[in-house]
Design a protein with these regions (language model features):
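Acidic/histidine-rich helix-loop elements
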Residues: 53-67, 95-108, 152, 156, ...
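Secretory targeting and sorting signals
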Residues: 2-34
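Short, low-complexity, Pro/Ser/Thr/Gly-rich segments in the mature regions of secreted, periplasmic
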Residues: 287-297
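Alpha-helical cap/lid subdomain in secreted, periplasmic
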Residues: 108-276, 280, 284, 291
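Acidic carboxylate-rich catalytic motifs and surrounding loops in phosphoryl-/glycosyl-chemistry enzymes
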Residues: 84-94, 229-238
Length: 297
């Protein structure tokens, strides 16, 4: 299933858990030189990436896996003696609009992912908790279609994301207990990979990257209005780095293209690629970006 050898993945995960992750917080001090282990729930809200979706030989378009960023985040905290009880309630294709009004493939009307999240938070108000919110990209996706970018669509959808995400977070924060931490998840642009072998698609990649940057700006402003940090996934994928590097099988490309090829399925041949979802290493990179935003309890 993977496009990275198992031994490399295992080594990378070990490094990510032990060395690369900065020890930011799910451990609190109860006295001089003493750490008190922390147990907390982890509510994972979002779309397909929140579920670790990747293409497989059985489902080339993608299926849920246990190698998503939530899984790596739980493993990284476990390596530090921290127990996160993971609850994944995301749904592939989820948008902020569907989150509010329903109509996805996972929750029968009148239920929604938002209702599921609110019910969960209400029943865990006296617990430590971590909530990640991974929304927005699917709202933008209809504007990035068949290697064309629709600026009017982008503007309209970003305004919708701003309104809907604000409403979603307000409801979540209202029912969450006092010891619940929220972290927003930013986005990378998988379509950057389209620029390496086709001049026409290179123009599309440029505009798609512009649209994703604006999406992240909107998300960041909404999260900041609630004093919620946002994981800088775009930076983890080096979206702004255009330094030329050599990639085996591809040649000389900008570093942002190389990163997307290394961290997603976009540069893989059929039937597994091209696919916009992260691979194991990509999900590890997202997990690390989230980890960097976790503050001490």
């Amino acid at each position: 299933m993977k496009n990275v050898p198992r031994g490399v993945r295992a080594a990378a995960l070990s490094i990510a858990m032990v060395a690369s992750f900065v020890t930011f917080g799910l451990v609190s001090s109860s006295g001089a030189g003493a750490d008190t282990p922390v147990t907390a729930f982890y509510l994972d809200i979002g779309a397909s990436s929140s579920l670790g979706v990747q293409p497989t030989t059985t489902y080339p378009k993608g299926q849920r896996t246990d190698e998503g960023y939530a899984d790596y985040l739980v493993a990284a905290e476990a390596a530090k003696g921290v127990t996160l009880d993971l609850h994944e309630i995301g749904c592939s294709g989820e948008t902020t609009n569907v989150m509010v009004y329903g109509g996805d493939r996972c929750y029968a009307s009148p239920d929604t992912q938002l209702n599921e999240a609110l019910t969960f938070l209400q029943s865990h108000q006296d617990e430590n908790g971590l909530v990640t919110i991974d929304l927005g990209f699917n709202d933008l996706l209809p504007c990035l279609h068949q290697w064309l970018t629709n600026p009017e669509c982008v503007t309209r959808q970003l305004d919708n994301v701003r309104q809907q995400l604000t409403a979603i977070i307000a409801l979540l924060k209202d029912v969450a207990g006092p010891n619940v931490k929220f972290i927003g998840v930013g986005h990378y642009d998988p379509f950057v990979a389209d620029s390496w072998n086709d001049p026409y698609r290179a123009v599309y990649a440029k505009w798609s990257m512009h649209a994703v940057r604006h999406l992240d700006e909107v998300l960041r402003l909404v999260y900041e209005s609630f004093e919620i940090p946002m994981a800088d996934v775009a930076q983890a994928f080096k979206i702004d780095s255009t330094t030329t590097v050599n990639v085996a099988g591809i040649g000389s490309v900008p570093e942002n293209v190389a990163e997307v090829c290394q961290l997603t399925w976009m540069c893989q041949p059929e039937p597994l690629g091209p696919n916009i979802h992260p691979n194991d290493l990509g999900y590890q990179a997202i997990a690390e970006a989230i980890e960097q935003q976790i503050t001490p309890w």
